[in-house]
Regions:
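Replication-associated primase and helicase/ATPase modules
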Residues: 1-12, 25, 29-32, 74-76, ...
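Phosphate-handling DNA/RNA-contact segment within nucleic-acid enzymes
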Residues: 2-111, 125-126
Length: 167
C-alpha cells in the first residue's frame, strides 16, 4: 500500500488511548520527531497528536511530508490525508492555524501553492497564509479544487493536474 510505504502510516489496534486509529509518524531528515493519529471511522475525535512530553519537536513547528519534497516547489495542505492524495511534494500544516515557524518553512521554497479545503473559513485562512508567505522571496499562489471539498475527495485527474502545474 502506497500510504504505508511512502508515508510510513500504520494501523493501531485496541490500545486504551488511541484505539482504532491510523498512526502517522512525522519525520524530519528521516527521524520521527512527533506523530499524530487519524480516526478510522467518522465518530470521535478526528485527529489526536502526541502530547508535548511525547514529541522531540512540537508538531506546529514543522511541516508534514517535508522529507518527501523533491525540489523547490510545494503544495500546502491542512493535513496528512490531503498530502497523501497529492503525493510527495505536498506538505501539511496540521490544521488551519499556521505558526510563524511553519510560515518561514513554507517561505523557504521558491514556489508555494496553498490548497486548503473548500470551506469558507479554510479559504479565508488560505488567503491569509498566502499574504504572510508572499512577503518572502518566491512565488505564492492559492488554488481551490473544483471536483471535491479537499484533495482527499477530489477527482484523481484534477490532482494529477495540480501536481503537473504546481510541483
Amino acid at each position: 500500500m502506497e500510504i504505508e510505504r511512502v508515508w510510513g502510516v500504520q494501523g493501531i489496534g485496541i490500545t486504551a488511548r488511541l484505539r482504532w486509529r491510523l498512526f502517522i509518524p512525522i519525520q524530519v531528515r528521516g527521524v520521527t520527531v512527533t506523530w499524530t493519529t487519524r480516526a478510522i471511522g467518522e465518530t470521535g475525535t478526528r485527529y489526536m497528536s502526541a502530547r508535548p512530553d511525547e514529541e522531540v519537536t512540537p508538531i506546529k513547528s514543522i511541516l508534514y511530508g517535508v522529507d518527501l519534497v523533491p525540489g523547490d516547489s510545494v503544495v500546502v495542505h491542512e493535513g496528512p490525508t490531503d498530502c497523501w492524495a497529492t503525493g510527495p511534494g505536498a506538505v501539511g500544516v496540521f490544521g488551519l492555524n499556521v505558526s510563524p515557524t511553519q510560515v518561514a518553512e513554507i517561505g523557504s521554497y521558491g514556489r508555494r501553492t496553498i490548497c486548503f479545503d473548500d470551506g469558507k473559513d479554510a479559504q479565508k485562512r488560505a488567503e491569509r497564509l498566502a499574504e504572510r508567505v508572499s512577503v518572502l522571496p518566491g512565488e505564492t499562489n492559492v488554488i481551490r479544487l473544483e471536483s471535491g471539498s479537499d484533495p482527499a475527495e477530489a477527482d484523481p485527474e484534477e490532482i494529477a493536474e495540480l501536481r503537473k502545474l504546481c510541483l
